[in-house]
Amino acid sequence: METNDGFLVINKDKGCTSHDCVKQIRKLLNTKKVGHTGTLDPEVIGTLPIAIGSATRFIQYLPQSKTYIGKIKLGIRTNTDDIHGEIINQKSWPKISEEKLDQYLKRFRGIIKQVPPKVSSVHVNGERAYKKSFRNEIFELAPREVKIKELTLMKWDQINGIITIKIKCSSGTYIRAIARDLGGILNSEGCLLQLKRISACGFDEQSSIKISDIEKAKKNAPKFIIPTISALDHISTYSLNKDEEINYWQTGRAIKIDINFLYECKAFDYKQPLKVVDSRKMLLGIGFLDDDHTKINPKLVLNAK
């Protein structure tokens, strides 16, 4: 089956790993160069963007925030920090109002430090934490800084001790850790009951598709692929209109920048990436302004010579 470079936004089912999805897409599209943009736990459903072909090189330039809707069960602590783990403690939960509960949630908004679950893909001395955990090894994980951009209380089921939240966060945030820690500050216990990712890396569930639908499409499956350049709409664009400039770019040489661009472009900070295109709006790669803002230095070059 023929394929195009770009992104497939998979609506992942429960029980399927992110790597399982990648393997299925490789087989369906008959291409080896496939990678996902961030692991979803097997029990988590929802949006899983998958890069195809040269799009795998652009993953780091996608928006990094992700949005979830999750349910937290108070009163239960497990060894995995979700409902599927072994119960290690149970405790009653407080009978508080939504307003009071939201006050507690405020502690998780902004930049916070969290200790990842021990059953996680975090590396510990060169090995995944979950492997050590499954061997019942004793180890500690260091707190990591994450950013919670939005955290909304959607529902508080006080009778059953279930909190429904919507959360927009940085890459690397563990919602299981938030469930565990929220239970702790409420003088109870907490674990993640259910989680759905509704957006990731600039893609949302409206643009997602089930792998079963891709299978049904067969040779027409590439029609679901979103072009790489469309996934980079959040990045300012610089156009190369001369063959000489394009040749310079494709041979890895810096391009002298048009001064008028600096007045129109939002990204004056040389640390911000620019997507470089030709006169037909075909993507040529990613570059960065130099310290003097006089040239664009190539960082990622498609069709390099």
UniProtKB/Swiss-Prot annotation:
The active site is at 41 (nucleophile). It comes from the Bacteria. It catalyses: uridine(55) in tRNA = pseudouridine(55) in tRNA. The keyword Kinase does not apply. NCBIfam families: TruB. Responsible for synthesis of pseudouridine from uracil-55 in the psi GC loop of transfer RNAs. This is tRNA pseudouridine synthase B. It comes from Prochlorococcus marinus (strain MIT 9215). The lineage of its organism: Bacteria, Bacillati, Cyanobacteriota, Cyanophyceae, Synechococcales.
